Amino acid sequence: MSTDQDLDTKKAAARAWFESLRDQICAAFEQLEDEAPADLYPGAPGRFAKKAWDRPAGGGGVMGMMHGRLFEKVGVHVSTVFGTFTPEMAKTMPGAAEDPRFFATGISLIAHMTNPRVPAVHMNTRFIATTKSWFGGGGDLTPLLGYQRQQDFPDAIDFHAAYKRACDKYDPEWHPKYKAWCDEYFFLPHRNEPRGIGGIFYDHHDSGDWARDFAFTQDVGRAFLEIYPTLVRRRMGEAWTADEREQQLIQRGRYVEFNLLYDRGTMFGLKTGGNVESILSSMPPAVKWP
């Protein structure tokens, strides 16, 4: 792995951005907790509890968890880890076969909402360096009720539009490509169904212009920060039924199945000695398999 000053500067810049984005997202989510109508969401507004962790083999991170009244469970985490891939992992990572040392920094979040009419969401962006370096990440929306799981539902239209704007600023071919990649990635083969309505997913993003690739990854984060609170405000005032809560709990089971069977981030974290509590914090707080 290159240890030149230029790469160190890039690592520091990426880490600083992910930590800044974490702070902005946590503030926005706490604001939503404050705004949630008390008749639907009794109790005190939630606040994030942050907990630092260290990775014995190098690096660490900060978990941010909130169990609120509107956000039933949300985790917003940052981590910066480094070390040496196992031979098994090195074979699967670009540039690691020649030199197994790696560096990875990023942000990840998953929000599970109290109200079944407010969709769950997942977002992550990351920067990874071996003898090569690249960005990856994306965001995807998971409505829990059937009528919301249609591409012509307003929330789906607006969610896709937000990421299209972020992509089109750089290349009009990126959004169709990364949207299709998201649909392919967040799919449960054993159920033959998508996890949600999609979004974008990208990986190994290295155009040769690091500053431009970094700017794109920042805009992906900003797009999330703009659109998801908008969708939450749109739906959080709607009352829900016991039947809708039941549908929500059953649909959450698909989330668990995907994360444990297919999710790259989960597997990467567990295979590189990541923080297990942080990795599995994506699990919903309550779920049913009928």
Curated annotation (Swiss-Prot):
Protein name, entry field: Oxygen-dependent coproporphyrinogen-III oxidase
Residue numbers binding a divalent metal cation: 112, 122, 160, 190
Q: Which Gene Ontology CC terms are recorded? A: cytoplasm
Q: Which cofactor does it need?
A: a divalent metal cation
Lineage top rank: taxon:
Bacteria
- The gene it comes from is hemF
Q: Where in the cell is it found?
A: Cytoplasm
Q: Which InterPro entries does the protein's record reference?
A: Coprogen_oxidase_aer, Coprogen_oxidase_aer_sf, Coprogen_oxidase_CS
List every stretch annotated Important for dimerization.
Answer: 255-290
Q: Which residues bind substrate?
A: 108, 124-126, 273-275
Task: Give the positions the UniProt entry annotates as the active site.
Answer: 122
